[in-house]
Structure formats: C-alpha cells, structure tokens
UniProtKB/Swiss-Prot annotation:
Source organism, top-level taxon: Bacteria
Designated name of the protein: Protein ApaG
SUPFAM superfamilies: ApaG-like
UniProt gene name: apaG
UniProt domain ApaG: residue ranges: 2-126
Originating organism: Shewanella pealeana (strain ATCC 700345 / ANG-SQ1)
Pfam families referenced in this protein's UniProt entry, alphabetically: DUF525
NCBIfam families assigned to the protein according to its UniProt record, in alphabetical order: PRK05461.1
Length: 126
C-alpha cells in the first residue's frame, strides 16, 4: 500500500431511508455519509471513485465515476472532507466497498481503499 494511502482514513455512517423505499417493489434506499480524513502532511485531491455493491442475493454492481457528489475535493493536511450520497438495493441487506483514486501534490496517483460496510434495514440483524 502506498504510504499516503495509509494516511487516508475513511469513516462511513449509513441510514435506511424508509420514506423513499418501497419494499413491496424490492426498492430499499440507503444513504451513506463518508468522512475522508487526510492524516498526512501534504494536500491530496480525490479524482475518482470505484464502488462494488453486493445485495443479499449476491447481485453485484460496480460504479465508477469522477469525484464524489459532483466535486473533486482537495483535502488539506490533517483535514477532512465529508459528503452524503445514496444507493438503492433490491434487498433489505447489502454490502458496499471500493476505493478512491487520489492524487498527491506531486501529481502521483494512489488508491485509498474503502473497507466493506453493511447496508441494512433496522432490526434485520442482531
């Protein structure tokens, strides 16, 4: 792992959006709020994202895109960037994981991993 990648912390909070979900139609909407912390001594810029989303039936989808929520933020040393986005699953349980392609101040790209996190309706799991 790139030394800078080890200096990027990714924290995730998830929520089930019941008011915009339709379980009878196999539509479960989840939001996720991500905080990306730059623990290094140099600025880094988030260029793109890659997600692998798996529902409870094993269906996988991949998402590749520039930036996050329409931005390619530069995160200063010892600072954080937070955003909220969402995804729709066909099951009440799923998992997301992936990575961010980041660029350091010298223009070198590196991958910052996003550990797997669970999307679940309340009360489904103990």
């Amino acid at each position: 792992m790139n030394q800078l990648a080890a200096s990027v912390s990714v924290d995730v909070q998830t929520a089930y959006i019941e008011t915009q979900s339709s379980p009878d139609e196999d539509k479960y909407l989840f939001s996720y709020t991500i905080t990306i912390s730059n623990l290094s001594n140099e600025a880094i810029t988030l260029k793109s994202r890659h997600w692998c989303i798996t529902d409870a039936d094993g269906r996988k989808s991949e998402v590749h895109g520039t930036g996050v929520v329409g931005e390619t933020p530069t995160i200063k040393p010892n600072s954080s960037y937070e955003y909220t986005s969402g995804t729709v699953l066909e099951t009440p349980l799923g998992v997301m994981e992936g990575s961010y392609t980041m660029v350091d101040s010298d223009g070198n790209e590196f991958e910052a991993p996003i550990s797997a996190f669970r999307l679940s309706i309340p009360g489904l799991l103990h």
